[in-house]
A protein has these predicted regions:
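Flexible interhelical linker loops that connect adjacent transmembrane helices
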Residues: 41-42, 224-251, 294-309
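Interfacial helix-cap and linker-helix signal at transmembrane-aqueous boundaries
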Residues: 76-77, 107-108, 195-202, 336-337, ...
Length: 571
């Protein structure tokens, strides 16, 4: 059967018996010589473990950096006299890390994973060191952008490398460790960030600067381990053309769209700035599609990948769930800090159930996938669970008990664990080995784009609604005797001044730090306003994520192979 297929492909007709035999012998000889190479495409467990430590160290850098900086950014802004510019430090990092994700994927398919991963870690270390000694918010934004150039490759390349050295059936177990790293960083980030911010100085260096300096030793350790241990079997250097036009058009297309997603609430979604960003972004992305169609297999994102049903459907699931679940996820720490009155450090600890849920979901899905070779059920269960928990989060109010928040956070985490890992495995199993890097990076890119747009849109909805909800809550409190009593208490004079400033428009909800020390009775209408606005966002998130259930159900359930049947890595 194999011989007939080869011959039919080659369109050989009217061949003599001796030609068939000669060709058959050559095929058999080729197969016998290459059987050992195919079997050795993947590494043994004892070889994988040290590599895994290096990959996880690099991944931990990127994951920790996002949460630790989020905790410290207000203090950093105050110290650098640029609190109003703090968003740019985050936006710059987000833009560069997002636009470089697909570039790392494609370039690693051409030049190899190891040199690109080492390059990514090195850039991240340099960016971290520069950020630690920033003298203004403008310079910090530039240095954070450099950090993002490295961060864009850390997660994508780590997943792609696992795809190179681990057979499809076993990938879920190892990739589960990566999900655990992200979960752990979400807890450690606020705790470590809170510790450094709370120090006036350490070894003569301002406390918040250690938020970035701590990345340097971790990065150097990861660099050493990866440099010494990472070896991908059957490495072959192949000459490929680099898709420069595709890279430029993608970059020019994504930057304005990401920028308007972050700043649209401030500019106004129909402002001149926003419309300009829309126009440049859409035109550039249209050009990107044209260039990619011309470049064929050399494209950064080969359009033929979308002909694969699994890749297309998982990409859609990634965008939708990225928007819904990460947009909804952004509400949890805000709820705990604004409505619950928790400090950033305490809020990080209160999100521990979410982390445990992610780890539980990843471990369960990883073991079952490894045992059965089937993955489809988990994205389906995960999207259903995410939808259900987001819907149940609409029950949150200003007086919700923490145990209920913890339960729903845990279930939300389980849903995340069931979606994040299996979707990557599904795509890696669907594409040829030569497309492993670009396919993995594409899934990550679509999820990041969804998360960026979703988070920005949900926060915009939150702050667009909170004013009206708070006003309604204040009107309902006018007849409350306890509220009137607190209003007349001279000890609450500063809180009353803040409330009056809000009502007259002299203050906004951009700074809510004063709520932590304010009288609880007086600010209860504000807490109600935020809680009601957040539940509205949770409802929208549930509706958005529910759409992904259909695409998860339609995703093919291809069985994962024991040793892999793809061609050896050729990069």
């Amino acid at each position: 059967m194999f011989l007939k297929r080869i011959l039919s492909i080659l369109r050989l007709k009217d061949y003599d018996y001796w030609v068939i035999q000669t060709f058959k012998e050559r095929v058999n000889n080729w197969m016998s010589k290459n059987t050992e190479n195919v079997n050795n495409t993947y590494l043994e467990h004892k070889e994988i473990v040290p590599i895994l430590i290096g990959l996880m160290s690099g991944l931990f850098l990127a994951a920790l950096d996002q949460t630790i900086v989020a905790t410290a950014i207000k203090t950093i802004g105050d110290d650098l006299n640029g609190l109003s510019l703090q968003a740019w430090a985050t936006t710059a990092y987000l833009i560069t890390s997002t636009i470089t994700t697909p570039l790392y994927g494609k370039l690693s398919d051409i030049f190899g994973r190891k040199p690109l991963f080492i390059w990514a870690i090195s850039i991240f270390i340099v960016g971290s060191a520069l950020s630690a000694f920033a003298t203004s918010m403008y310079s910090l934004a530039i240095y954070r952008a450099i950090q993002g150039l490295g961060a864009g490759g850390l997660f994508t390349l780590a997943l792609a490398i696992i795809g190179d050295i681990v057979p499809p059936r076993e990938r879920s177990k190892y990739q589960g460790y990566f999900i655990a790293v992200f979960g752990t960083s979400s807890v450690l980030g606020p705790v470590i960030g809170g510790f450094f911010v709370g120090q006036s100085s350490l070894i003569g260096i301002t406390g918040w600067r250690w938020v970035f300096l701590v990345n340097v030793p971790i990065g150097l350790l990861a660099l050493f381990i990866v440099g010494r241990t990472l070896h991908i079997p059957n490495f072959q250097k192949v000459n490929h053309a680099i898709d420069w036009l595709g890279a430029i058009s993608l970059t020019v297309g994504l930057i304005p769209l990401l920028l308007v997603a972050q700043e649209g609430r401030v500019w106004g979604w129909t402002s001149v700035e926003s419309i300009t960003c829309y126009s440049i972004g859409i035109i550039s992305l249209i050009l990107f599609v044209i260039f990619e169609n011309r470049m064929k297999d050399e494209a950064i994102l080969p359009l033929r990948l979308f002909k694969d049903k699994t890749f297309s459907l998982v990409s859609v699931v990634g965008v939708i769930t990225g928007a819904g679940m990460f947009g909804g996820l952004a509400m949890l720490p805000l709820y705990l800090q604004i409505v619950g009155g928790s400090s950033p450090t305490r809020a990080g600890l209160e999100l521990l159930p979410l982390t445990l849920g992610i780890m539980t979901g990843s471990i369960i899905s990883g073991r079952v996938i490894s045992k059965t070779g089937k993955y489809k059920i988990f994205p389906v269960i995960g999207t259903v669970l995410l939808t259900a928990t987001l819907f149940l989060m609409t029950t949150f109010n200003a007086d919700t008990k923490y145990w209920w928040i913890a339960v729903l956070s845990y279930l939300f985490g389980v849903g995340l664990g069931h979606v994040l890992q299996p979707t990557v495995i599904a795509v890696q199993n669907a594409v040829a080995k030569r497309d492993l890097g670009v396919a993995t990076s594409s899934v990550t890119l679509f999820r990041q784009l969804g998360a960026t747009v979703g988070t920005a849109a949900f926060i915009s909805i939150l702050f667009g609604k909170v004013g009206k909800e708070t006003q309604n809550a204040f009107q309902n409190s006018v007849t409350n005797p306890e509220y009137q009593k607190a209003l007349m208490d001279p000890n609450n004079a500063s809180t009353v001044q803040q409330l009056q400033a809000l009502q007259t428009g002299q203050a906004t909800f951009d700074d809510t730090s004063w709520l932590a020390s304010a009288n609880r009775t007086l600010i209860h209408p504000i807490l109600d306003g935020f809680a009601n606005s957040m539940t509205y966002v949770f409802l929208i998130g549930a509706i958005v994520v529910s759409a992904s259930i259909i695409f998860a159900i339609l995703t093919p359930n291809n069985k994962l192979s024991e040793r892999g049947d793809s061609a050896p890595v050729s990069h």
